[in-house]
Amino acid sequence: MRATIQKLRQLPASLQGLLLTAVALLVLLASGPQSYNGYVIQLICVYAVAALGLNITTGFAGALSLGQGAAFALGAYVTAVLAGTYEWPFWLALLLGAVSGLVAGAATGFPAGRLGVIGLAMISLGLVLVVNDMLIQFRGVTGGMFGISGIDARLWFKSDPVDSLWVVPAAIAVVTGLCFWLHSRYRLSRLGQATVAVRDEPIGASALGVSGYLTKVAAFAAGSAFAALGGGLFAYLSAYISPDAFSPNLSILFLVMVVLGGSGSRLGPLAGALILVLVPLQLDEYPHVNTIVYGLLLIVLMRLRPRGLFSRSAAPAPKALQHVTDAPAVPVPARESGEPVLTAHDVKRSFGGVYALNGVSFTVHRGEIVGLIGPNGSGKTTMLNVVCGLYPPTSGRVVLQDTDLSGLSPEAIARRGVARTFQTPKTFPGMSIEEHLALAAPAGEPDPELLAACRQAVRRLLELGGLDPADRAAMTRESRAMSHGQLRFLEAATAISGCPRVLLLDEPAAGLSASEIEGFERVVADVAAAGVAVVVVEHHLDMIGRLVDRVVVLDLGTVLWEGPPAELHDVDSVRAAYMGVR
Ligand SMILES: Nc1ncnc2c1ncn2[C@@H]1O[C@H](COP(=O)(O)OP(=O)(O)OP(=O)(O)O)[C@@H](O)[C@H]1O
């Protein structure tokens, strides 16, 4: 069973979608499209479509939505009004139903996308209650409590309803397969990778140029479109709809389908829909205990599989690593410092009136490695945070070549070529190594020499972490299982794979062994030799002595001394402030 699932997982998404449609059609053929079993199979498909949509919003984007039932109801009513009242063709009624969900999802996502998990849950729950009430109140359109009947499938405007019993079942089977394919494509796309990155580590994602807000709005819109399409299919399946079919419980049911199946996984929503439609129907034969057994079953399943039945969320990122594995070894040029790349001009940054940076100025040149050192709390990390846009400066400016970075968002600064690592690696647990590198891949056409050097550096960093870039299985595994050292190398490899102009490294040696530090130093030196300006914040003074061209010593938010590392130990003020020697 496990081997079969493994093989099915490895099929391309398009084939998986086709297979799903074929299986649904075969089962429908065996049971008869008008039979009770046929109805149940179609209901599973319809709910699966809505659950796949919710998996985009909640699973991929991590936005807890309790409002999937509202989009489902909206799609059902838009489709039912167009099909029943205006006698539109079924394909167009379904399409417009889905579009209504897309628009409603985007309209919800724009204000809701900036809220935290609880705020989002509250807004979406409010939406379900509002929509449910509107279905009753706007009876001129919705039929109020009586609902809408006569929802017949037509091929063209005002034509007679189609005779065939197969139109609706076939449409349901095809749309389910199509939605599964679209859902998988979404996860595999750059947008999907960005969405998961924001879910797992929003600050790390912003450092790669990803806008968290837009990924959430897109996920809301896509998730609602799926739900509305499911709702439209439900209207045709039932031929009659009323508000009773869309109680707030429906949204909870969709959520449980996603969580039970495995939030964020690609097969989970299908499994969730299958189980949560079939199990209650089987239990209906035992009316006194059915709810108790159903509840206990859910508890036991979640206890045994806390991340759901299908927990794997990482997806292959085709060709992401080919350029790394196939890259020929490149000779490393001698390192020379060139023109200024990054300049801090009198940067101040205060927190509640206390200045963490109080007028810091320094310059980093092309190909140069600058060590930013100083005692704990002297402002080193704050300086990196100001450069990469996480903290806007209180006053002063940071200039990247000719661009003033002050006031730009972290995403905008990252897109201009500033990459960084963090004291604690901000990698994305639900994404594979391949996906990390694919997400960070440069958007434009970088200088070929820089590109070759960066690819070589990425390969060597992965190897330093004991990861073989040619080992496809390892490269497609979720990074959540990786050790601290491996994550450090992965984070650095990710930052470098974007071919940055400036590389900021925050305590890269922390937690690494002596040999790992040495290997890391060689990679950083080679990247600098290819023209990248590097700033290293580090307490490991031996590493600083070996690696950097120039040291900038911070103390209490000001530059205490600047010069070559060899002279560091001879400067009294540095010894006093930094090493505690008075
Ligand atoms: N978000 C924040 N809110 C309030 N104070 C902050 C914030 N970030 C930094 N600080 C303060 O700014 C000062 C400088 O902190 P910073 O982390 O930049 O020092 P550091 O030199 O990197 O220290 P370490 O070597 O321990 O990492 C500290 O006093 C710190 O408490």
Report each predicted region and the residues it spans.
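The feature captures the beta-strand-to-loop junction immediately N-terminal to the Walker
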Residues: 370-375
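Catalytic Walker B motif of ABC-type/P-loop ATPase nucleotide-binding domains
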Residues: 503-507
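Conserved ABC transporter NBD signature motif
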Residues: 396-403, 416
